[in-house]
Amino acid sequence: MRIHDVYTHLSADNFPKAEHLAWKFSELATDPVEVTPDVSEMIINRIIDNAAVSAASVLRRPVTVARQQAQSHPREKGGKVFGISGSYSPEWAAFANGVAVRELDFHDTFLAAEYSHPGDNIPPLLAVAQAQRSSGRDLIRGIATAYEVQVELVRGICLHEHKIDHVAHLGPSAAAGLGTLLHVDEETIYQAIGQALHTTTATRQSRKGEISSWKAFAPAFAGKMAIEAMDRAMRGEGSPAPIWEGEDGVIAWLLSGKDHVYHVPLPEHGEPKLGILETYTKEHSAEYQSQAPIDLARRMKPLVDAAGGTEHIAEIVLRTSHHTHYVIGTGANDPQKMDPQASRETLDHSIMYIFAVALQDGVWHHEFSYTRKRSTRPETVELWHKIRTVEDPEWTRRYHSDDPAKKAFGAKAVITMADGTVIEDELAVADAHPLGARPFARENYIEKFRTLAQGIVIDSEQERFLHAVQSLPDLDDLDQLNIEVDISNQAATKAGLL
């Protein structure tokens, strides 16, 4: 790996295009280095993972709305929309599928200087691959690039400290991945990356206060923008440049300003793209930084029960990282995170609610743990409001560690009972993390798929999909990666414009 310094340049500066970060990513995208077998296998795992969470969300209202919007754009040679037959304009197919993947906050993650869900790259690449009749091998190569670009951006450039949403790293990564998939030249990829970033620099209000369904639509929109950017670039049009480093560019006015230098790691030419291997999926449907606390709560439940049960708890303090405290903890100062009437999207960003329910139930369910009946249970509300988070410098240091063996996304829970008894335990990483108690392997991804698809995807369709996806390196018909279900029970929606 090499480190590329990224900072603002005046328009009058001699700043060669070859030094632009967007150009560096275009070089990465066109590097013909082979995808390693373990990366190829992990890409298959993540396609299975996305299908699993899409099956669980396919009938929900936001996903139904996005699907109906896509259905307004049929195309003879297009992309497939999860759940239904037919072909649709690829940018709209990607949009619908992106919402389905993101709706339940239940797929993969990478956390470093910024947050990300790199599996959001898969819907736009798959939709375009289907429309272009690309091969499974081409899709694998494109996804490897997209993950690599997103992982390196997340390592090098923090967005949230300036209240910019993390989809600003998704537009460029999806555009770069599309470049690899489509075998286009560096100049085209460079221009597509510029437009994709320019159109996806949204604020983090989508994840603040009363969180709406736009949290699921936001990455889908970024994927759609990446496809449109690539289409326009392929037709010979240019984009704002240098998009990161320009005098009026992203760094100068949206991020740390004209005097700041970002350090973005990049693979050397010919170095395999291994970024996906440093990402991790979720066992539980909730914000990633709550994964380890959920497992910790489940582990602590027998001790709490032996001490009298949750009704005898006086206080719970979760000592954790800066990110966890300020994004999903009491450091956010969001009263909505303590509100029993809050939206599901808000509750899955409240570690106080999540820890309370996991401690009481000993399990976490992608639907039942979020019902209004569950969130308004009096004893749950009482416990929930006894929980607070505290930033611990050691947890913050471990969160940002460059050593995978030391990097941690968990917390230490200090539970004080009414009689003064103190119960303490901590967990650094979730059980499903590569270094966790039960690291996810292929069989776990398949089990997650079967569990979430049960009652929604018929058994024969499950088997057909699993056979196709596990044959991806040799698969010529990528339409086989779509899954059809009975959508007659889809959520009711209002009429729109499209």
From Swiss-Prot:
Entry keyword annotation includes Lyase: yes
Enzyme's top EC category: lyase
EC number from the UniProt entry: 4.2.1.79
Gene Ontology MF terms: 2-methylcitrate dehydratase activity
Superkingdom of origin organism: Bacteria
KW Chaperone (keyword) present: no
UniProt keyword list: Lyase
Chain segments annotated as transmembrane: none
Other noteworthy facts: The prpD1B1C1 operon seems not to be involved in propionate degradation.
Protein role: Catalyzes the dehydration of 2-methylcitrate (2-MC) to yield the cis isomer 2-methyl-aconitate.
Family: Belongs to the PrpD family.
Description of how the protein assembles with itself and partners: Monomer.
Protein name (database record): 2-methylcitrate dehydratase 1
UniProt gene name: prpD1
